Amino acid sequence: MTPIDAKRPLQLNDQGQLRHFLSLDGLPRELLTEILDTADSFLEVGARAVKKVPLLRGKTVCNVFFENSTRTRTTFELAAQRLSADVISLNVSTSSTSKGETLFDTLRNLEAMAADMFVVRHSDSGAAHFIAEHVCPEVAVINGGDGRHAHPTQGMLDMLTIRRHKGSFENLSVAIVGDILHSRVARSDMLALKALGCPDIRVIGPKTLIPIGIEQYGVKVYTDLAEGLKDVDVVIMLRLQRERMAGGLLPSEGEFYRLFGLTTARLAGAKPDAIVMHPGPINRGVEIESAVADGKHSVILNQVTYGIAVRMAVLSMAMSGQNAQRQLDQENAQ
């Protein structure tokens, strides 16, 4: 499995600050830590009576979702609103794209409305990078998920969840379980865990749902759930993505649950204080039983809460990086 993007200077300005957020591939550990630290500082905003800070006042954030989403779209909207930005959410099913307008033309029109930032989710891998290459230089682009490729804000909210519950990545064993082949979350989590110094990253699933060459990410591959879960600190369950599957990859959902579904009995093989995560939406009785999803080890709802803070961090840092680059360009032009 070859990652679509190597290190992307496009994501950073000339001073090494974030200006787009397209993938975690190639981003330095220091920058990922800065995102986590910034997100940590934003968590208290959600506990205020007035849940707003003025960092993006006067800015317009456009959510352009070409795939259905509940958590990602809603948390991006809340994140932008809590930063005091104006928010536009494009309903693709009623937009001109459903009448034949191209993605490029749609974004050009939004650009003409003086939007400052696009949050884009698209079914095509590489869509967010394409947009970042073609929008005007003043617009920041945030990847809300593109095909099988990347979901960088989900990756970072997962890292914040782990850090807040476990403190450090340096001695952790983390298992990512399920449909690895179709999961952009798995790719982003693997990249983030490796960059942040996690020494033991495991992927667990049927052979048909594990990409060829995944070992290049520095992970250990298991096709037996009990063996893979032994003594892990963190279990990240993945949604079974039937909508992306070709025929023959999986006999049935029941068979998948029998072999790879996370039950209380199977979780007992992990460490006693292990945490259980899931990016959602959860398919109960397919990837995970309700007793685990709702049990004492589950931090799934924490992930949703932390997602708002992480997206606030990314939006504010990308806008700050764009502003710094604009000022630098103006100084160089004089």
Curated annotation (Swiss-Prot):
Binding residues for carbamoyl phosphate: 71-72, 121, 151, 154, 280-281
Assembly and interaction partners: Heterododecamer (2C3:3R2) of six catalytic PyrB chains organized as two trimers (C3), and six regulatory PyrI chains organized as three dimers (R2).
Known EC number: 2.1.3.2
Gene that this sequence comes from: pyrB
Gene3D superfamilies attached to this UniProt entry: Aspartate/ornithine carbamoyltransferase
Catalytic activity, as annotated: carbamoyl phosphate + L-aspartate = N-carbamoyl-L-aspartate + phosphate + H(+)
Family per similarity comment: Belongs to the aspartate/ornithine carbamoyltransferase superfamily. ATCase family.
Regions annotated as coiled coil: none
Transmembrane segments: none
Protein name: Aspartate carbamoyltransferase catalytic subunit
Binding site for L-aspartate: 99, 184, 239
InterPro entries xrefs: Asp/Orn_carbamoyltranf_P-bd, Asp/Orn_carbamoylTrfase, Asp/Orn_carbamoylTrfase_sf, Asp_carbamoyltransf, Asp_carbamoyltransf_Asp/Orn-bd
Pathway: Pyrimidine metabolism; UMP biosynthesis via de novo pathway; (S)-dihydroorotate from bicarbonate: step 2/3
GO MF term list: amino acid binding; aspartate carbamoyltransferase activity
UniProt key word Transferase: yes
GO BP field: 'de novo' pyrimidine nucleobase biosynthetic process; 'de novo' UMP biosynthetic process; amino acid metabolic process
UniProt keyword annotation of Transferase present: yes
Function: Catalyzes the condensation of carbamoyl phosphate and aspartate to form carbamoyl aspartate and inorganic phosphate, the committed step in the de novo pyrimidine nucleotide biosynthesis pathway.
Pfam families in UniProt: OTCace (PF00185), OTCace_N (PF02729)
GO annotation, cellular component aspect: cytosol
Enzyme class, first EC level, given as a word: transferase
Originating species: Pseudomonas putida (strain ATCC 47054 / DSM 6125 / CFBP 8728 / NCIMB 11950 / KT2440)
Keyword terms of this UniProt record: Pyrimidine biosynthesis, Transferase
